[in-house]
Amino acid sequence: MEYWSSSFIDGASSSSFISPFYNFDHFSGNQDNRCLGTMMGAQQDILHVPLAMVESGYGEESNSFNGQEKKKKKMTSEQLKFLERSFQEEIKLNPDRKMKLNPDRKMKLSKELGLQPRQIAVWFQNRKARWKNKQLEHLYESLRQEFDIVSREKELLQEELIQLKSMIREDSSCKKKQTWEKACS
């Protein structure tokens, strides 16, 4: 079966062609499974994908590299400990928190640990994200404690203000009373 037949090139309908105008919306209410290609003048009935394309896995991503499949190695606890020590060193070396993994260092770690450089880079990226989240949690906690202290101080000052205002009112009412008594006598 020839997929790119001359009838397709001439614009005629081909049962093995997936039109870019096909309506993939199954909830559109259009139950006749026709192509939206009517705008272009060509109308196709039910879409058929050739069995050969489905069986060969056409369009699926392949995990093969030069014909060989490479499986992602799971890191051992020793490798993880080594990476963690390396990450802690990186934190100490970069106090400004710009912990971008140097490509030379990445390759060195890759060779030492027997892992793919991409695995090293992803591990560092994930660890950096976790570290940043932890730093934000600590910062939030310290800010929350400071806020609680300031909030409590504000409440104490407001209570003191209320007491002082009441003392002023009492004092002024006493003075008015004394003035009234002096005026009456």
UniProtKB/Swiss-Prot annotation:
Signal peptide: none annotated. The keyword Transcription applies. One of its GO terms (cellular component) is nucleus. It is found in: Nucleus. Residues 136-164 are annotated as: Leucine-zipper. SMART domains: HOX. GO terms for molecular function: DNA-binding transcription factor activity; DNA-binding transcription factor activity, RNA polymerase II-specific; transcription cis-regulatory region binding. Pfam families: Homeodomain. Its main location: nucleus. The keyword Nucleus applies. Residues 76-135 bind DNA. Expressed in siliques. It comes from the Eukaryota. Keywords: DNA-binding, Homeobox, Nucleus, Transcription, Transcription regulation. PANTHER family: HOMEOBOX-LEUCINE ZIPPER PROTEIN (PTHR24326), HOMEOBOX-LEUCINE ZIPPER PROTEIN ATHB-22 (PTHR24326:SF531). Belongs to the HD-ZIP homeobox family. Class I subfamily. Probable transcription factor. This is Homeobox-leucine zipper protein ATHB-22. It comes from Arabidopsis thaliana.
